[in-house]
Structure formats: C-alpha cells, structure tokens
C-alpha cells in the first residue's frame, strides 16, 4: 500500500528542507512506498527567507503547497502569542480550523510535523494522525532542540536520542511511535565535555551560546539521525508494521506498542552514509 503523507513545516531553518528532501529521495529510489500528498507551511510567501526557500523546493517537486501565516492570522485577530504551559488562545483554535478547511481537499493517511512550530488544538489532533519529530529520547527533555541540548549538557548525559511520537495538544507528550539513541560520550567528544566542564555550563552558555563546540557536536549527531528516523518510521507505516488505532500506535497484530527502538537500523544507515 502506498502511504499518503501530509507534510507540515514552519521552515524556520534549513533542516525542514533536508527532511523533506530525504523523504523524497527515499520515495524516488524505491526505499519508501509513499507519496507526499500535500505540504502545509504556516508562513506565507515573502514572510521569511528560509520558508520561501522551502516552499520553492516544494513547488519544484510538484507537490501541492498550502500556506497560511499564523503570524498574520494572529495580528488580524488581535490575539496574544500562545505561551508554553497555558491553554491555547481562541485565535489559535480558529487558525487550526482554517487550516483544516484549507486542507480538506487533500486527503492523507498520516501527517508528519517536521519542524512545525505550532501545537495543534484538540480538534486538529483528533482529525488527523500526526507524527511529531522530537530531538530527544523517550523520557528525555522537552522543548525545542536548543533547550534539549542545553539540558543534556547540564545533566552530563551519556546518550542522546531522537523520537517520533503521535502529536497531541500537550507539548511533546504523545505516545511514542519510534526512537533511536546514540552516544554523546567516548572518543573525541570527551575533550569537548572537558572544555565545557572547565568553563562551567552556565558560563559556557553565556560566553559561547550555540557556538560552544560541545553544543554543536551534539546537534550534529542528532541531525545526522533525524532524516533516517523519519524515513524508517514512514516505512513501518507503509509496510503496515505499525498503524494508529484510537490514537495509539499498534503493531501488525493490533497490540499497543511503547515505541519501536530503531537504534540499530539508524546507526547502520549513519555508518553507511559516512
């Protein structure tokens, strides 16, 4: 069965384009039996340079593109910015309803949130089965990738991870579908840990910020695994090894799963890619 995918991205950075390109390449070379039925971006053309480049990539691939600026929608509604940990303001619910209306002509089996910076309201999360890419292992730090990395450094963690979970109205708390973990200790990275420890985490963060070598290396290792995890996860759906029933991931027998550990497959792919 060819899996039909809806793709959602804010495209604030270049990673969104890399994720989509990786999926399209896997489709083209036959590794993934899927099609991207539609791409949605919550930035309008001309609003952001990175989003513009992403949208041009979508158009060049011949994929239907739908855009609706969440920023301009909020301004037109006179609404306040949604705050972490607080209920979504009414304008956000109205925005999601408009997104659902715009996407109604485009049916898809599963949605992928790849760098989509908005939390869906209950109605949208109930309407679609949505996979969210989160740059931490199950049970790991919540929040944006920057927050995750700083928390890993503060913890002095040995391992990091990437997971894909079902999106819910609660930030990064949906049922885990797949994940992988990887070492952030041992070998050359240990020297970067020693440098960060010598500075002190807070001092290093204040002085170097995201240019801290340890921060950059942890981020590099995570990004290397994001595209393979997205592709391998979509393969589990295309092969019907995993499905979503009643907002829970289940295996081919219908049993609820706690998340497939794809670490072995992802490490093999990373090693083969050099």
Role assignments for model-derived ranges:
Residues 1-274:
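One-carbon transfer enzymes
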